[in-house]
Amino acid sequence: MKPYALLSLLATGTLLAQGAWAEDPEVLFKNKGCVACHAIDTKMVGPAYKDVAAKFAGQAGAEAELAQRIKNGSQGVWGPIPMPPNAVSDDEAQTLAKWVLSQK
């Protein structure tokens, strides 16, 4: 029975470690593929994070709006190329939005 307890403990530790990584916005941006179209201060296919932060600066509800766009995608906001929906949870979208808005 003890080997199962150890295995269970190790599995729980692995899940907790993955959860900690999921909270790191920079790791999320890499793991979710955001970096394929975005950079911090350089426009690529999509806008630079700093440009997004500047556009939303001072707007009420900016974090929730950006989180919704990250999760569901958007079109016609930054030009003709749409941003597709992303496979992120609500919490991940919120984490990403908060981090993007902190870029100045």
Curated annotation (Swiss-Prot):
Gene3D superfamilies: Cytochrome c-like domain (1.10.760.10). GO terms for molecular function: electron transfer activity; heme binding; iron ion binding. GO terms for cellular component: periplasmic space. It is found in: Periplasm. Its main location: periplasm. SUPFAM superfamilies: Cytochrome c. The keyword Transport applies. Residues 1-22 form the signal peptide. Coiled coil: none annotated. Binds 1 heme c group covalently per subunit. PROSITE patterns: CYTC. Keywords: Electron transport, Heme, Iron, Metal-binding, Periplasm, Signal, Transport. Heme c binds at C34, C37, H38, M83. Electron donor for cytochrome cd1 in nitrite and nitrate respiration. This is Cytochrome c-551. It comes from Pseudomonas aeruginosa (strain ATCC 15692 / DSM 22644 / CIP 104116 / JCM 14847 / LMG 12228 / 1C / PRS 101 / PAO1).
